[in-house]
């Protein structure tokens, strides 16, 4: 099974407007939708992103965790549009398959921007947002202090140029964590195996063109409760982006997690789940 794949009893799939959509479903109760993070493409699944929090969050909720196109098992999909648009359509397709009309959406990294895009495109489907480790826009937003491209962005480009280089994969994964010990031999081996099993996702991702699109001016249109959870040591999306998003959305609260990189639900799962549960309970959603 490995670190990237959920136990078979939790694995689900459906067909969306762009093709196959894979997701994880577990728990009973009010729905909660989670969207996977950005990372190695392919090789970053919803299970890898949220395995550390799903058992707890699923104790009182029906949790749906969706793979992003070409990163997990969703796809393969070749596109020429803002990358978060087909991702949002995949999330909506998973919600439709589960009979979920509306729900709070939790996303980190690319999954968070996908949640923002879904909330802007179909506000009736999103009752609350937990985001972070993200830009508001496809293609990124301006940085005031941090260098661009980011360390993780450079490492991702190096891996894309040499997709079979295990050393490049290991270096990329290390940039996603505060603690380099998180990049175990098991994680590298499982990610490598997943990438070899899904060459069509690798080809589709390489052939796709993500068109930049700014959501900055639209953020004030989001009126549902919002929480931003950002790792203080994020080397992909600097912490200042969490400050920026929370400043554009008046009702958004911001939580900084120290000793945490780009994947808060992976590196700080207890604290991440604490914040999500408190947010949902406080807002009655």
Map each language-model feature to its residues.
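Conserved HGGG/HGGXW glycine-rich cap/lid loop of the alpha/beta-hydrolase fold
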Residues: 19-73
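Active-site loop/oxyanion-hole signature of alpha/beta-hydrolase fold enzymes
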Residues: 52-55, 64-106, 274
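Gly/Ala-rich beta-loop-alpha elbow adjacent to hydrolase catalytic centers
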Residues: 107, 111, 115
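Flexible "cap/lid" loop of the alpha/beta hydrolase fold
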Residues: 116, 120, 127-161
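Conserved alpha/beta-hydrolase catalytic His-Asp/Glu region
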Residues: 162-220
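Short beta-strand/loop motif that positions the catalytic acidic residue
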Residues: 222, 228-230, 234
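Conserved alpha/beta-hydrolase "acid-adjacent" motif
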Residues: 235-241
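Catalytic active-site module of serine/aspartate enzymes centered on a nucleophile-bearing elbow/loop
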Residues: 251-285
